[in-house]
């Protein structure tokens, strides 16, 4: 459901001969799997996470995993063993320290100074960090950029019209995204009692002027349709939404916004136009069953 081109994703998954999914929850994708490998959550395993803020963070196992859930590294090594590979990592937590040392050697230009022992002491270190005495670099490009003259090169961008613009049949622009209470597809947050109580159902946001023009009120059922798919959900007023646009979060499987997106590519950057497409909005429609993920599911 998180794939921004959901029609393509569903078609591709349906054509597979065998699908294996590793996850901590039975997600929409996991329900399609032939085999589900139950994984462990962050506090149930020891390992590192490297973020886009250039930080390597150590996480230590704090609690035992439930049921048959296993750590990622254990699962990977069992698959490798089944494929005839002779991996023999030694040490605690299935040899996670040895695996990290392999990563450090492969990424020596960035994290050579971040040893496993150092992470045990400091918990997290920012890279690039090239020696154990190096404190790390929270900010990069302070003195110069990686260009021939050391200066940043700014290039003015020309506005290119969208591939699919509103017309008489599809007069609105669809914007998809996240909302405060639910992360991505809600596989975790919709199981959180408090968060799910705040935002339990799928809604579309429109400004008051557009709602008045469509003759719909707060909480009314509307149907949003593009040339590729449609969803039915309730409408809420948000005057922060531009006139002529409708915002739909993609956290709800019962009203999957990514069924409607446009996969056309930008002619230069080849970036899909998933965040902009033309849609029609009509009052009424039949809501899909909202079963929720269930807190204990």
Predicted features and spans:
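Short, glycine-/Ser/Thr-/acidic-enriched flexible segments
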Residues: 1, 25-27, 41-44, 62-64, ...
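Flexible glycine/proline-rich, aromatic-decorated loop/lid segments
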Residues: 25-60
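Flexible, low-hydrophobicity surface segments
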Residues: 55, 155, 174-176, 224-231, ...
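Long, contiguous, secondary-structure-rich segments that constitute the structural scaffold
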Residues: 66-122, 185, 189-205, 209-297
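Long, low-complexity segments enriched in small/aliphatic residues
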Residues: 96-194
């Amino acid at each position: 459901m998180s794939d921004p081109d959901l029609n393509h994703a569903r078609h591709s998954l349906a054509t597979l001969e065998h699908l294996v999914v590793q996850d901590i929850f039975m997600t929409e994708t996991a329900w399609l799997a032939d085999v589900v490998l139950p994984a462990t959550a962050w506090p149930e395993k020891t390992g590192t996470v490297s973020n886009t803020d250039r930080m390597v963070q150590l996480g230590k196992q704090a609690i035992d995993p439930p049921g048959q859930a296993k750590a990622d590294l254990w699962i990977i090594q069992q698959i490798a063993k089944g494929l005839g590979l002779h991996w023999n990592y030694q040490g605690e937590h299935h040899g996670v320290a040895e695996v990290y040392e392999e990563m450090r050697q492969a990424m020596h230009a960035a994290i050579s100074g971040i040893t496993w022992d150092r992470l045990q002491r400091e918990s997290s270190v920012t890279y690039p960090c090239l020696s154990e005495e190096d404190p790390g670099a929270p900010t990069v490009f302070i003195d110069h950029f990686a260009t021939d003259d050391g200066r940043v090169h700014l290039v003015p961008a020309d506005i290119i019209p969208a591939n699919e613009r509103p017309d008489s049949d599809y007069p609105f622009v669809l914007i998809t995204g996240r909302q405060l209470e639910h992360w991505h597809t809600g596989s975790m947050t919709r199981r959180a009692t408090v968060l799910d109580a705040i935002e339990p159902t799928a809604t579309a946001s429109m400004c008051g002027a557009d709602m008045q023009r469509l003759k719909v009120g707060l909480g009314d059922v509307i149907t949003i349709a593009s040339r590729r798919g449609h969803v039915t959900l309730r409408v809420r007023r948000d005057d922060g939404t531009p006139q002529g646009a409708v915002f739909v979060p993609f956290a709800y499987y019962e009203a999957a916004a990514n069924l409607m997106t446009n996969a056309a590519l930008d002619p230069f950057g080849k970036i899909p136009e998933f965040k902009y497409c033309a849609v029609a909005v009509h009052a009424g429609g039949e809501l899909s069953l909202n079963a929720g993920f269930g807190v204990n599911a």
